[in-house]
């Protein structure tokens, strides 16, 4: 008996979380995702897509748009256009958006955890019990800093649109490390998730829509 035979004959305990919630989310979107630019979803101008797969099974999860130079330029233009208005908001007003993001992340924590596991291959215990709770805490934490920024750092100045590239090993957690402080400080964002682990960034873009984040403040280009 070889290793493959052993794996095929082993008895496995029930999974601590069902993938059904994430699979239903993918099905509702026909497992096809565009680019999130200026608060709306667009197909890549080239029409190109690539597949993202479950690393545990090699099963295709979704088709994702491949952004080209003109798509990235559009996202940067949207971030530049949104910057003056976002910067002009008081820290308290920006904090309300960050707090709303934290609440939505908390509300959909199970979906984020299961989707991250399917797309990245981490164990559900790591995504559910470590990564996603930390993501939520980062947004709550930086909502607090946004509110205190004017009094604690009265000379601070927002930089402007920032480009953020996310690695595959901590897809949503690294997003929170970069996006939360950038938005709290009055910057706008163009985010590029890792090719292999884009799905939770796209789900995050959806919740940005749901809370009414101003168009162009947060943009996602995939590829």
Feature annotation, model-predicted:
Residues 45, 72, 109, 128, ...:
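Alpha-helix N-cap/helix-start motif
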Residues 148-223:
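Rossmann-like NAD(P) dinucleotide-binding subdomain of oxidoreductase/dehydrogenase enzymes
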Residues 37, 51-54, 60-74, 212-216, ...:
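Histidine- and aromatic-rich ligand-binding microenvironments
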Residues 22, 33, 60, 82, ...:
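Glycine-rich, flexible loop/turn motifs
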Residues 41, 83-86, 145, 168, ...:
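Signature tryptophan residues that serve as conserved aromatic anchors
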Residues 59-149:
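Glycine-rich loop-to-alpha-helix module at the N-terminal edge of alpha/beta enzyme cores
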